[in-house]
Each structure stands twice: as structure tokens, then as C-alpha cells.
Amino acid sequence: DDGIQGRRAHFHNTYCTICTVTPDEAYGLGMNFAKKLNCATAPVSFFIPMRGWSAYDIEKPDIKKGWAGPGAGPSWIPSEKNPRWSFRAERFTEGFLGNLKKDNQNIQVYQVDLHINDPDFNELMYCDLRDMLKGKWHKGKYEAGNKIKRIF
């Protein structure tokens, strides 16, 4: 369905219509997030879920992540480089890394091969925040595994 300004829209119910950002807007969001994080004076971990950003931005049905199908979520756009990844996540990452100051030692960025609604993605962020609050945070702690890649 046509949504606002040509966006894909999913009419969830009478009261809720889901419209997602375009890939170009995702790039702009990445730029803006980077500019804000460039000022960080305390530890910052930034996790980018590469397999989708919402229940409707998903490659295939998964009721536990919020999309029962049929088929891919209504706002899913696969990456040409890696079809299992969201094109929006890829564009966000490009805008983000292109504007992030590489000399700020307080920032670490992870590209995570998981969906935002994946319990493992949420556990990763929880553990990182817990470590920050307990004073046990250090850069690169969560690089283990094939789903997580520290890109900065």
C-alpha cells in the first residue's frame, strides 16, 4: 500500500498504520546519530541490528519477533550485498560510520547479525549496560561469536 510520501505502509488496524523510514532517511539518521555521539565523554556502545528494525522489517515470518506472515514483513527491503540484512540498516551504517569521529575512545560500534526483536540482541544490550553501570565495561568485550562484529 502507498503510505505517507510514497512510503510502504502497513495498516495494522483502524488505529495504527505503520510507515517506515526510507533508505535515504536511514542514511540521514545515521549521520545525525554519529554527530550526537561524537560529543561523548563517557562510554558509549552502539549496536546496529542488521536483520531488521521492527516486526514488519523482517526477512521471513517469525511470530516471536512480531510478524506471522505470510512472506517477508511489509516494510522489508533486503540489502543487495547481503540479502539477509536490511537495506535500511546498511544505509544507516553507511551514514553513521561516514560521520563518526574515529578519535573518540569512548565510542564502540557493533554491527550485529540479528533482528532488533531477537532475544539475543536484547540480551547483548542488557549485558553491555549492566557492565557500564557496574564499572566493568571495556571496549571490545562482546566481539566473540559470529553474529557480532565491532566495526569501530
In which residue ranges do the predicted regions lie?
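Metallocofactor- and cofactor-centric catalytic cores in central/energy metabolism, strongly enriched
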Residues: 16-152
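Redox- and metal-dependent alpha/beta enzyme cores, enriched for Fe-S-associated oxidoreductases
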Residues: 1-14, 57-61
